[in-house]
């Protein structure tokens, strides 16, 4: 009888771990670097600015300069059905990003979902800013 309980417990642990990994944005290496005077990031010159950088991450990057002047970066891959790699688009004004496939919306301040069906935030990357360069890495 103990063996049956142990087997059931192992099955429950295995299936619960698999469910946690479902719907996760894949891990890919990200190493974006640009000089601060690069025209691709000129939208970050003032607070509230955001830019889209293609060719990095799963579906590209969004870099946002928050009102407190901190920089944050997110993968554009929506956390709703990430296996589709649906790239979120910037809304106007640049306070949210929308998943065109599901209609979900995400805050650019911290990547959290602000409109269903999203339940998980956008994947966030580390941003490093020096006197001359901005880097987005993981």
PLM feature spans:
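Sec-dependent signal peptide recognition
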Residues: 1-8
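Short cysteine-rich clusters marking metal-coordination/redox-active sites
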Residues: 78, 98-99
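N-terminal pre-ligand scaffold of iron-sulfur
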Residues: 19-93, 107-108, 121-138
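C-terminal motif of bacterial Sec signal peptides marking the signal peptidase cleavage site
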Residues: 13-16
């Amino acid at each position: 009888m103990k063996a049956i309980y142990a087997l059931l417990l192992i099955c429950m642990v295995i299936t619960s771990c698999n469910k946690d990994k479902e719907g996760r944005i894949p891990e890919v290496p990200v190493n974006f670097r640009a000089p601060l005077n690069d025209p691709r990031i000129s939208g970050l010159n003032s607070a509230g600015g955001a830019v889209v950088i293609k060719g990095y991450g799963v579906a590209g990057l969004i870099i946002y300069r928050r009102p407190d002047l901190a920089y944050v970066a997110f993968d554009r891959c929506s956390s709703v059905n990430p296996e589709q790699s649906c790239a979120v688009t910037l809304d106007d004004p640049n306070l949210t990003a929308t998943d065109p496939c599901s209609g979900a919306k995400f805050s650019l301040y911290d990547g959290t979902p602000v409109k269903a069906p999203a339940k998980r935030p956008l994947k966030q990357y580390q941003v490093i800013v020096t006197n001359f360069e901005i880097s987005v890495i993981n």
